[in-house]
Amino acid sequence: MFTLSLLSRGHGKLVQNKQKLEVYFEPEDYLNWKSPEDYILVRKPQDEGNADQHTWSLFLPKTFSTRKGALILYSEGLAISAWTPEERRKGPYRPKGRRKRPDLELHTLQDLKEAILAYGRRQREQDRAWQPYLHFRSQPESQGLRQIQPGYSAKRYLRGLLRTWPPGTINKLQCAGYIKDSVLLQDSQLNVPKNLRPQQDLSGVPLKYHLLPVFPPFWIQQGKSFGQGQQDLDEGEAGAGGQVDQGSVVKDRGIQGTCLPPLKKQPWQKDETQTEDTSKDNHHCIHTSKENHQEKAQQTSRRTLGHALFDHSWLLHDKSHTTFYYGGTFPNRKADLSDKQGTMKLHQGRSSHLFKEPPAERCLFPPVASAAGSEKNMPGDMKKKKAPKALKLPLISEEPPRVLDPLRSQLKASEPPAELFIFPVEIHYHSQHPPKGKAQRRGAPQPESAPETEEYTSSWRPPLKQVSLRGSRALRVHLPMDTDRDTLSPQEDVAPPQKGTSSPSLRKGKKSPESQRGPDSPRTSGRSSPTGPPCERPAGGALPAAGQAYESVSSNAGHGEEESSIQHLLKVNTESRTDLHMNLNETSPLTQKPENQGAQQSLEAAAQKTGEPQSCINKGLICSNRKEFYTRKLHLDMTPFLKASREEMDDHEEGGELRENHPDAQDPVRRNMTLDPLCASLAKHMQTPEADTVQKASKDYNVHHRHRGLSGHGPDSPEGLDPIDTSFLPRGKEGKTEPRLFNQKTSNNISNEMELIEKAKSRKRAKTDKSKAPKREKEGKLHEEAEAAVGKSKESKAEKKSQLISKGKKTGAKGKRTRKEGNLETAAELSGPDGINSKETKDRSGGGFFRSGSGVEDPWVSSKVEAPESQVSIDGRSSPTQTAAVPGNMEPEEDRSHEDPSKAFLVKREQEKASRDRLRAERAEMRRLEVERKRREQEEQRRLQQEQLERAERMKEELELEQQRRVEEIRLRKQRLEEERQWQEEEERRQWLQLQMAQERARQQQEEFRRKCQELQRKKQQEEAERAEAEKQRLKELEMQLAEEQKHLMEMAEEERLEYQRRKQEAEEKTRWEAEDRRQKEKEAARLAQEEAMKQAQDQARQKDALKKHLHFHQELHKEASGLQWTHNISRPWVYSYFHFLQIPRP
């Protein structure tokens, strides 16, 4: 309501001094009548089915009539509550406890604003200019279904409240156990004064949550499905004390992403007891039955599937790469480990920072035990037969498992991890199963069956068309793994290694024949077993895969069954058939030349039979400068441990020349395709007892090496065609159960293959040295990055074969090189420019791979149908960049050996030329687009500069005009002041002259008056003199007359003298009476004149009084008339009837 005036409060004001009470109006009184309508809340549904919306209708206000109009005293509309009229008619009595709430509920600040300002909502547009109310800028109908954006989470506000508390209170509450959430205390900063603590404005719009710059792009761009399970990154901070349910995680995260089947809920206590019971037999369970391994793999896969989540949009992303946190923890998960049971609890954490010191309970991967402690847990044979040249990355210091310290975490949460070692790469590596004791030590449940694993494997392959669209380049690095560090202490969830595990040598430069695989070849990644150091030991020298690193964050990778789940994950991922390698030709020689290639060749033959996987790191598509940065970073971090690897640079540079010019390397789309038709149908081979051969080979060299392709397998060797499914077998236990028969068959095939490869390589080396060397220097980075996904695995496999066989057979290495070259040519033919087409990819997977018609062709063909579904690893950890092309290697070796080398060379040249032309066209188009963009930018810059110049010129002109105007104003002001001064001087001079003239005139008047006075005095004196002379003459005459009369009297007689005396007295008497009469007349005349003067004076006074009265009357009359006119002018708006103002306005 308006502010009440004196009149409405019952007060008046005395006006003038007549003791008359006059009404004194205030401005508030004149504003009341300006409100033509008022509003009350009336229930009126805007749409059917929604009766909670209201409108505001007209209500006549209460008024007070005065002699000059109507005054609005108050309005009932402002005093009515938000109850609807129907509710108010139900009765005044309602119990306090069961009082019905009003229909109009205020949920947001906008609703409150509507309730406060609703009486001004429906005003007419033309009336809003003079109404003194606030109005809505938009109609309420458009805001009925408005989405409300939530603010910060409750934890954020609680932390903001905790900042205002004194540190002593927070400490008391924490010590008393009332505050158990360490995340709430994380930002409280108890040891920092209040004035120095960072303050957050919780009243504004919440900012976007900050992510680390090392996150891969698909986490941020495609983070919708990833963040679906988290629901709120900030609310996840409160989850440090709770345990996430596996089924709920799958349910929450399966909204947008492709979610794996949920698991059966199994209590962690059962897993922990199994861990304690079975860990005692860890060193004695080396030779375990085949069924136990299969059941363990199945159980591990089922537990992994319960937490795995991936989205097809991630697989199709063309710039995605995975960042691996070496020695640190993943930002989106926090794992807490209890003191004695080792239970891993998965929590959703903030993505804005990492923990400073990642202890064993927080690390996604357990830290590495010391070398001495690991050797104690190793068998005696493993100590004696370790790889001679294995890369040893720095160890992570052991930390006993401990309970999470909230104070320490909150003080150190803002600092980065001390041992953060970032590899933005994509990783393929071993899939070895740990012993039974190891899996149970981590809380892994007992295995079930292998057929279910095959179903999961085949059901989680995305469609081939989707995968074929992925166009990311890959960069690989060979990182050797040290067997003496594969073993991890029980506190760190690491079990001792088994026999048959050894570290692969680090390779650089030379690509294996598998690296030349076409776009249809599968290249997925998984996580290695506990004996495979990339998973359990981030500091041990191996890195997790890109997709795996991501899924380890979005799945239950932090749980205790980590190692056992890794084994099953790589059951599908073993199609990569590549060792952990990265193409670092341009940065540093990271290769290591093995001392004995014969041992490697024999080991390669064994690896081909067992189908052991090799880890590989695939770096996603990155620009050349970014690739150089990460490559140099990797080189700098690993140089102290790779001094001996520089000798192998020359040996592997030869294969690099062929790789630089490979046609598939020119096609960025085909390079990134993934086809996995081999995994699902070949999972059954894991049940074959083939571990004895692997065990024998592991004593010669590292069992972690995996065969480079199918080139070394004969058509009648099922294991030659099934290198990926043997990854289901645990490497430690497979070592002694593998048959030796396949090793002999594979060695013969390898020797024949390497001879053919060596011949073709010699021919191509001579040609590529002449023609391709200059171009390789210019396009080295591009080719290196492009061929990392296509040609590296083939050459690395063939190179490893040659190294393994050269230990016993020097000629075998030469044959393997020849056969490797043939594989390279065959892969080039099969992976042509048209390899992007998904149909051709399926055709090649069906027919192009198996032209020999061997006995193993049926399983391969049958698995082709399931390829689109089983294209990624079971746990969903395969990154979009984990792609490779392998159609060439899948072709039987006999067909490749019988092909015409010249024809293959011509086909390869044509494909290389087409690829170069296509690449050149793409570069030209990119250059054109870049030039166009730069031209547009230059035009825009010129336009902006022109506008800026024009704006500056206009501002300059306006400034000049303003200055001129000011100068003119100053000049006019000075002129006006000068004129005023002159006028004042003239006025003063004129006044002075007038004063002088007046003084002169007064002086003259005084002189004239004095002169007249003197003349009158002189005349008066003269008259007095004449009168005195006349009187003196008269007296003299009278004396003479008296003397003559006396003389005459003496001469006269007595009688005559008496007569004379009598006449003389009569004459004197007559003169005296005449004088008296004249005096009486003069006196009477003076009296009459005085009376007449008095009468005239009275008449004049009477006339003057009458004139004064008349003037006063006229003055009073004029004053009254003017005052009346002023009064009438003020009160003119009030002459109408107040009903005129209370009429209902027209709609």
Curated annotation (Swiss-Prot):
Protein name listed in UniProt: Uncharacterized protein KIAA2012 homolog
- Keyword annotations from UniProtKB, A to Z: Coiled coil
Q: Which spans does this entry mark as compositional bias, Basic and acidic residues?
A: 268-296, 768-802, 895-945
| Disulfide partners | none
- Annotated region Disordered: where? 226-245, 255-297, 431-617, 647-670, 705-945, 1003-1032, 1060-1090
Lineage, uppermost ranks: Eukaryota, Metazoa, Chordata, Craniata, Vertebrata
Stretches with biased composition (Low complexity): 538-549
What positions belong to coiled-coil segments? 743-804, 907-1112
Has UniProt tagged this entry with the keyword Coiled coil? yes
- Mind telling me which PANTHER family this protein's record contains? CCDC66 DOMAIN-CONTAINING PROTEIN, GENE 973-RELATED
The reply on keyword Repeat is no
Top-rank taxon of the source lineage equals Eukaryota
Compositional bias ranges of the Polar residues kind: 584-603, 743-752, 870-884
Q: Where is the composition biased (Basic residues)?
A: 431-441, 807-819
* Family annotation (InterPro entries): DUF4670 (IPR031440)
